[in-house]
Amino acid sequence: MLPCFQLLRIGGGRGGDLYTFHPPAGAGCTYRLGHRADLCDVALRPQQEPGLISGIHAELHAEPRGDDWRVSLEDHSSQGTLVNNVRLPRGHRLELSDGDLLTFGPEGPPGTSPSEFYFMFQQVRVKPQDFAAITIPRSRGEARVGAGFRPMLPSQGAPQRPLSTLSPAPKATLILNSIGSLSKLRPQPLTFSPSWGGPKSLPVPAPPGEVGTTPSAPPQRNRRKSVHRVLAELDDESEPPENPPPVLMERRKKLRVDKAPLTPTGNRRGRPRKYPVSAPVAPPAVGGGEPCAAPCCCLPQEETVAWVQCDGCDVWFHVACVGCSIQAAREADFRCPGCRAGIQT
């Protein structure tokens, strides 16, 4: 980490300029600010009133102090330089502190626009590759090639980007978002560290017809015993339903025995808990299918016909034919007369 000091521009039309200074080790130096780019390290070129900034407007004097720098500001302008809104006498040096506000140009009367060049002074410690710093100052009265702004590049082999491909968003934008303690921020290497993000997989939008529909497994049903409701015929019975309910058709429908989840099979996996469920199904075909197993079927004509399955032989009966109630079938085991006779013998 290198001790540096910065000028962060927070006023004017452009804003966002950040100048980082790192004097040569072991020696003091002077940096100049003004509109003469050939003589100054920081060129201040006003867009509104060019006459308000002198050729060499002010100087920053840096002297080593321990492992840090003592920086003072000296005014050389005809229009004035302000530190914390107090005008600095011409030719007078003032030591700067972290967080001081510097204004280059006259202080306008109340109600007028402020100076274009309004900076905050900061003392920071940064890595060389984090900032492009002004190192060697220009000699007085000379315009040497290579003097002034000289970027501090990372060590050999470290990843870097050319200065011509810098991001349009200046680094100072990150600092402006947290004015409270600018010098205490830990700078992020944005200038020379490439941040190529790999292709991100975006979620594939679902077709319009599938929005809001999620497949779900049919509810678990008891294969041993159930109660059905047979609805009366509808006028539009000829139109098949779009999504038939996944429930057991009546056992008289032999064509769908293999697909009905509640049709009894030869291989039983133990006695499950009895849980009769009522579900609407299509009406039975007249004269077809398996009838009720009761010896004397009363052929119920109600709109809703309830069925119950024997817990012994898995045969289905009309609830009305066996003389029990739906509530009793839910709460206790049901045995048909044949199974009860077999138990007694």
UniProtKB/Swiss-Prot annotation:
Protein keywords: Metal-binding, Nucleus, Phosphoprotein, Transcription, Transcription regulation, Zinc, Zinc-finger
Its job: Potential transcription factor that may play a role in the regulation of genes involved in cell cycle G1/S transition. May bind to regulatory elements of genes, including the promoter of the transcription factor FOXO1.
Protein name: Transcription factor 19
Gene name, Swiss-Prot/TrEMBL: TCF19
ZnF PHD-type: positions: 293-342
Residues annotated as domain FHA: 31-88
UniProt keyword Zinc, yes or no: yes
Subcellular location, record wording: Nucleus
SMART domains registered for this protein in UniProt: FHA, PHD
Residues annotated to bind Zn(2+) 2: C310, C313, C336, C339
Chain positions recorded as Zn(2+) 1 binding sites: C296, C298, H318, C321
Modification type Phosphoserine: residues: S78
Location of region: Disordered: 147-167, 190-227
GO molecular function: zinc ion binding
